[in-house]
């Protein structure tokens, strides 16, 4: 149980960064093309 609690925040942070980076790229592409 303790291992899952310690690893889940470790996984959430990179996932949020990846999602934010992808969304940012999509916004930039959308602005460039439109």
Swiss-Prot record:
Can you tell which superkingdom this protein's organism belongs to? Eukaryota
Q: What is this entry's stated membrane topology?
A: Single-pass membrane protein
Which Gene Ontology cellular component annotation is one that this UniProt entry carries? sarcoplasmic reticulum membrane
Q: Where does the entry say this protein is expressed, by tissue?
A: Highly expressed in heart (at protein level). Detected in heart and soleus, a postural muscle group of the hindlimb containing the highest enrichment of slow-twitch muscle fibers. Also expressed in diaphragm, which contains some slow-twitch fibers. Not detected in the quadriceps, a fast-twitch muscle group, or in cardiac atrial muscle. Not expressed in the prenatal heart but gradually increases in abundance postnatally.
Keyword Transmembrane appears in the UniProt entry: yes
Q: Which GO terms describe its molecular function?
A: enzyme activator activity
Record keywords, A-Z? Membrane, Sarcoplasmic reticulum, Transmembrane, Transmembrane helix
**Summary of the knockout phenotype:** Mice produce offspring at expected Mendelian ratios. Slow-twitch skeletal muscle fibers display delayed Ca(2+) clearance and relaxation and reduced SERCA activity. No significant differences are observed in peak muscle force and no differences are observed in relaxation rates at low, non-tetanic stimulation frequencies. However at tetanus-inducing frequencies, relaxation rates are significantly slowed after tetanus.
Bilayer-crossing regions:
12-32
Cellular location(s): Sarcoplasmic reticulum membrane
Classify the main location: membrane
Q: Does the keyword Transmembrane apply?
A: yes
- From the UniProt record, give one GO term of the biological process aspect: positive regulation of calcium ion import
Matching Pfam families: DWORF (PF22030)
Role summary: Enhances the activity of ATP2A1/SERCA1 ATPase in sarcoplasmic reticulum by displacing ATP2A1/SERCA1 inhibitors, thereby acting as a key regulator of skeletal muscle activity. Also enhances the activity of the ATP2A2/SERCA2 ATPase. Does not directly stimulate SERCA pump activity. Binds preferentially to the phosphorylated E1 and E2 conformational forms of ATP2A2 which predominate at high Ca(2+) concentrations during the systolic phase of the cardiac cycle. Competes with ATP2A2 inhibitor phospholamban (PLN) for binding to ATP2A2 and displaces PLN.
Q: How does it assemble?
A: Homooligomer. Can also form heterooligomers with other sarcoplasmic/endoplasmic reticulum calcium ATPase (SERCA) regulators ARLN, ERLN, PLN and SLN. Monomer. Interacts with ATP2A1/SERCA1; the interaction results in activation of ATP2A1. Interacts as a monomer with ATP2A2/SERCA2; the interaction results in activation of ATP2A2.
Comment block on domains? The transmembrane domain is sufficient to compete with phospholamban (PLN) for binding to ATP2A2.
Return the protein name.
Sarcoplasmic/endoplasmic reticulum calcium ATPase regulator DWORF
The organism encoding this protein is: Mus musculus (Mouse)
From the broadest rank down, the organism's phylogenetic lineage runs:
Eukaryota, Metazoa, Chordata, Craniata, Vertebrata
Annotated gene: Strit1
């Amino acid at each position: 149980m303790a291992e899952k609690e310690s690893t889940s925040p470790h996984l959430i942070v990179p996932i949020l960064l990846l999602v934010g980076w992808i969304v940012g790229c999509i916004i930039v592409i959308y602005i460039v093309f439109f």
